[in-house]
């Protein structure tokens, strides 16, 4: 991309402004999470996969609203519009010792009694036990934490410990902002959403490694130890900028097409991925690289994880 071929942007010098922006967004996300806990008892909008219960997607053939369906079900179930105006999703929790099949059958029976069997069709049904839902929550958390651990170990071996720490900071930044977004807009957390979060983690890490690899390459060039580390990191970011813009741009183009044409079933999954690509691109430039500078300035952690006695200027 010739537009950024000879770029010389001073990204690291703008890191404090980026810290402010990230801090504001992260704080807003935490506030939304706390608000959700106070209002609903849960910091996220967990789907049936994680809470247990029954989910029934129905298509109605009469001019029925969510309020009409709620009245037919005695107002005890959560009903939301899904995709087209004639499609709704009914969610009903189930007790630990309850029958999830009985709950789904009861919902269909009540709707048929109120509107007639020809007034609607059941498009799909999902049923998850409460115990299984709790186990899935725990396993999803383990998956994310385990990915952080593997990231740190891999980068500590492949690069140095400080690179691994900086990458984990950037990835944690991306995940927290994504969770804040999900909390703010009450996006349902289901298994596809967790898959999207793990995909974000991988995409963000890939962007970060590309920049870190160029930093390491420039560190080994002749005369690098006499250079200001900030200038060296800026040069590395600028050299990888065309690749970053092209990769993120083409990925976003595909995801936008998927969002427009993919339908409501994968809408939340696609939205989370779009957000993740944008945040991952931002963090690889304004979070990971500045974090590497800050870690080096404060602790100078090298491959063995020990503070160097006399760090050289270009040992970023």
Label every PLM stretch briefly:
Residues 1-316:
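A structural signal for conserved, well-ordered secondary-structure elements
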């Amino acid at each position: 991309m010739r537009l950024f071929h000879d770029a010389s942007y001073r990204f690291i010098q703008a890191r404090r402004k980026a810290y402010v922006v990230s801090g504001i967004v992260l704080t807003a996300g935490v506030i939304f999470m706390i608000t959700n806990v106070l209002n609903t008892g849960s910091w996220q909008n967990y789907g049936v996969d994680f809470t247990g219960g029954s989910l029934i997607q129905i298509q109605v053939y009469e001019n029925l609203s969510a309020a009409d369906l709620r009245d037919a079900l005695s107002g005890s179930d959560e009903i939301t519009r899904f995709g087209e105006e004639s499609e709704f999703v009914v969610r009903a929790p189930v007790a630990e010792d309850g029958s999830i099949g009985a709950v789904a059958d009861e919902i269909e029976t009540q709707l048929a009694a109120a509107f007639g069997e020809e007034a609607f069709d059941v498009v799909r049904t999902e049923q998850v036990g409460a115990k299984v839902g709790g186990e899935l929550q725990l396993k999803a958390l383990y998956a994310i934490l385990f990915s952080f651990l593997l990231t740190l170990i891999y980068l500590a071996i492949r690069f140095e410990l400080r690179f691994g720490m900086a990458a984990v900071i950037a990835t944690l930044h991306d995940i927290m902002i994504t969770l804040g977004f999900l909390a703010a807009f009450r996006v349902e957390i289901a298994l596809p959403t967790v898959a999207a979060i793990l995909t974000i983690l991988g995409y963000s890490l890939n962007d970060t490694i590309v920049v870190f690899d160029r930093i390491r390459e420039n560190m080994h060039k002749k005369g690098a130890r006499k250079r200001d580390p900030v200038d060296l990191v800026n040069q590395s970011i600028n050299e990888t900028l065309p690749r970053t813009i092209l990769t993120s741009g083409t990925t976003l183009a595909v995801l936008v097409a998927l969002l427009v044409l993919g339908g409501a079933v994968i809408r939340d999954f696609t939205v989370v991925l779009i957000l993740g690509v944008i945040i991952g691109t931002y963090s690889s430039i304004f979070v990971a690289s500045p974090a590497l500078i800050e870690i080096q300035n404060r602790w100078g952690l090298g491959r063995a994880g020990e503070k160097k006695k006399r760090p050289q200027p270009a040992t970023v």
